[in-house]
C-alpha cells in the first residue's frame, strides 16, 4: 500500500480562495495590497519564478509591482530601486529575487529591505523576531511545510522531526517554527557534518529533505508510516528531481510530491504574508 500524497496544489487553491475574499475586503476599505519584485538580469529560472508570482497576484486581486533591471546595474542603482519600493505606499511587501549577479552583495541588498515590507520573511530582523516569538512575516517555505502537515492531520506536537539541510530559507527557520509552543515538535537538524544520517531518519515521525541532492533519502532510511516532505530540487539528465527516492512512497505513510508539494505553498504564503501586512496597517 503506497503513501498518501500531500497535495500542495489543492492546498494552495484553498489558500487562494481565502486570500481572494480577504483581498476583496481590503480593497473595499481602500487598502489594496501590492506585491513588488526586483529582478536583476535575465536568468530564465528567475524570470519564470517572478512571472509565476505575478500570475498568482492576478488570481487573488493583489496589485503587481515589477522592477526588472539589467544584469550590469551598479550597487547604487539597486539600492535606489530598493529604497523606492521601501517608500512606495502602493507596495505592501516585496522581494529581491535571488540569485543576484556576482558583482552585487546579496546580503547587503536583503538587509536594505524595510523589515515591514519583507514578503519573504527572511530579513535578519524578522528572523530575530521569529526566535523571540514576536509577530513578523514568516519564512514562506517553512510556513508552507507546517501548513501542509496540519492540512492532512499529521500530528506535530510531540513528534520527532528530522530536517536534512541547514539553509537559511528552509532548514534553520523550519526548526524555529516547529519548536514554537503552537507546534511543540522535537527537531533534529542534520547537515553535511551529521554522523550516521540513516540512524536518525529511521527514528523520525516526520522527515524533511531540503538539501538539493537527488534521491538522497531512500526507503531504507525511513520508518514505516512516517511523513516525508520533499523540498530539495536537483537538475538531472531526466529533468528536475527531488531529494526523496521514489521507493520511499511504498514505505512512508504520507509523502509530498516534488514538484507539486511544497513549492505551490511557498508561493501561496508569499501572498499570505503580503495580505497579512496589509491587514496590520
From Swiss-Prot:
<dbReference type="InterPro" id="IPR020630">
    <property type="entry name" value="THF_DH/CycHdrlase_cat_dom"/>
</dbReference>
<dbReference type="InterPro" id="IPR036291">
    <property type="entry name" value="NAD(P)-bd_dom_sf"/>
</dbReference>
<feature type="binding site">
    <location>
        <position position="233"/>
    </location>
    <ligand>
        <name>NADP(+)</name>
    </ligand>
</feature>
<keyword id="KW-0028">Amino-acid biosynthesis</keyword>
<dbReference type="GO" id="GO:0005829">
    <property type="term" value="C:cytosol"/>
</dbReference>
<comment type="pathway">
    <text>One-carbon metabolism; tetrahydrofolate interconversion.</text>
</comment>
<dbReference type="GO" id="GO:0005576">
    <property type="term" value="C:extracellular region"/>
</dbReference>
<dbReference type="Pfam" id="PF02882">
    <property type="entry name" value="THF_DHG_CYH_C"/>
</dbReference>
<keyword id="KW-0560">Oxidoreductase</keyword>
<protein>
    <recommendedName>
        <fullName>Bifunctional protein FolD</fullName>
        <ecNumber>1.5.1.5</ecNumber>
        <ecNumber>3.5.4.9</ecNumber>
    </recommendedName>
</protein>
<dbReference type="InterPro" id="IPR046346">
    <property type="entry name" value="Aminoacid_DH-like_N_sf"/>
</dbReference>
<keyword id="KW-0658">Purine biosynthesis</keyword>
<dbReference type="GO" id="GO:0005886">
    <property type="term" value="C:plasma membrane"/>
</dbReference>
<dbReference type="GO" id="GO:0009086">
    <property type="term" value="P:methionine biosynthetic process"/>
</dbReference>
<keyword id="KW-0486">Methionine biosynthesis</keyword>
<feature type="binding site">
    <location>
        <begin position="165"/>
        <end position="167"/>
    </location>
    <ligand>
        <name>NADP(+)</name>
    </ligand>
</feature>
<dbReference type="GO" id="GO:0000105">
    <property type="term" value="P:L-histidine biosynthetic process"/>
</dbReference>
<dbReference type="Pfam" id="PF00763">
    <property type="entry name" value="THF_DHG_CYH"/>
</dbReference>
<comment type="subunit">
    <text>Homodimer.</text>
</comment>
<feature type="binding site">
    <location>
        <position position="192"/>
    </location>
    <ligand>
        <name>NADP(+)</name>
    </ligand>
</feature>
<keyword id="KW-0378">Hydrolase</keyword>
<keyword id="KW-0521">NADP</keyword>
<dbReference type="GO" id="GO:0035999">
    <property type="term" value="P:tetrahydrofolate interconversion"/>
</dbReference>
<dbReference type="GO" id="GO:0004488">
    <property type="term" value="F:methylenetetrahydrofolate dehydrogenase (NADP+) activity"/>
</dbReference>
<keyword id="KW-0511">Multifunctional enzyme</keyword>
<dbReference type="GO" id="GO:0006164">
    <property type="term" value="P:purine nucleotide biosynthetic process"/>
</dbReference>
<comment type="similarity">
    <text>Belongs to the tetrahydrofolate dehydrogenase/cyclohydrolase family.</text>
</comment>
<keyword id="KW-0368">Histidine biosynthesis</keyword>
<comment type="function">
    <text>Catalyzes the oxidation of 5,10-methylenetetrahydrofolate to 5,10-methenyltetrahydrofolate and then the hydrolysis of 5,10-methenyltetrahydrofolate to 10-formyltetrahydrofolate.</text>
</comment>
<dbReference type="GO" id="GO:0004477">
    <property type="term" value="F:methenyltetrahydrofolate cyclohydrolase activity"/>
</dbReference>
<keyword id="KW-0554">One-carbon metabolism</keyword>
<dbReference type="InterPro" id="IPR020631">
    <property type="entry name" value="THF_DH/CycHdrlase_NAD-bd_dom"/>
</dbReference>
<dbReference type="InterPro" id="IPR000672">
    <property type="entry name" value="THF_DH/CycHdrlase"/>
</dbReference>
Amino acid at each position: 500500500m503506497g503513501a498518501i500524497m500531500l497535495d500542495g496544489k489543492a492546498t494552495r487553491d484553498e489558500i487562494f480562495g481565502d486570500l481572494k475574499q480577504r483581498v476583496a475586503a481590503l480593497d473595499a476599505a481602500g487598502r489594496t495590497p501590492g506585491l513588488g519584485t526586483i529582478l536583476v538580469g535575465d536568468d530564465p529560472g528567475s524570470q519564470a519564478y517572478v512571472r509565476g508570482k505575478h500570475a498568482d497576484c492576478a488570481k487573488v486581486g493583489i496589485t503587481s509591482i515589477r522592477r526588472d533591471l539589467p544584469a550590469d546595474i551598479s550597487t547604487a542603482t539597486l539600492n535606489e530601486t530598493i529604497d523606492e519600493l521601501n517608500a512606495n505606499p502602493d507596495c505592501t511587501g516585496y522581494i529581491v529575487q535571488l540569485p543576484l549577479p556576482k558583482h552585487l552583495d546579496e546580503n547587503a541588498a536583503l538587509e536594505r529591505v524595510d523589515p515591514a515590507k519583507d514578503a519573504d520573511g527572511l530579513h535578519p530582523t524578522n528572523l530575530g523576531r521569529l526566535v523571540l516569538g514576536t509577530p513578523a512575516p514568516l519564512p514562506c517555505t517553512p510556513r508552507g511545510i507546517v501548513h501542509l502537515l496540519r492540512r492532512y492531520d499529521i500530528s506535530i506536537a510531540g513528534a520527532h522531526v528530522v530536517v536534512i539541510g541547514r539553509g537559511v530559507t528552509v532548514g534553520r527557520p523550519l526548526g524555529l517554527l516547529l519548536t514554537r509552543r503552537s507546534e511543540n515538535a522535537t527537531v533534529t537538524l542534520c547537515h553535511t557534518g551529521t554522523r550516521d544520517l540513516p540512524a536518525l531518519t529511521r527514528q523520525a515521525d516526520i522527515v524533511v529533505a531540503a538539501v538539493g541532492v537527488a534521491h538522497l533519502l531512500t526507503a531504507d532510511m525511513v520508518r514505516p508510516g512516517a511523513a516525508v516532505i520533499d523540498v530539495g530540487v536537483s537538475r538531472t539528465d531526466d529533468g528536475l528531481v527531488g531529494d526523496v527516492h521514489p521507493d520511499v512512497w511504498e514505505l512512508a505513510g504520507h509523502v509530498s510530491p516534488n514538484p507539486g508539494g511544497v513549492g505551490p505553498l511557498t508561493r501561496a504564503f508569499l501572498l499570505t504574508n503580503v495580505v497579512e501586512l496589509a491587514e496590520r496597517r
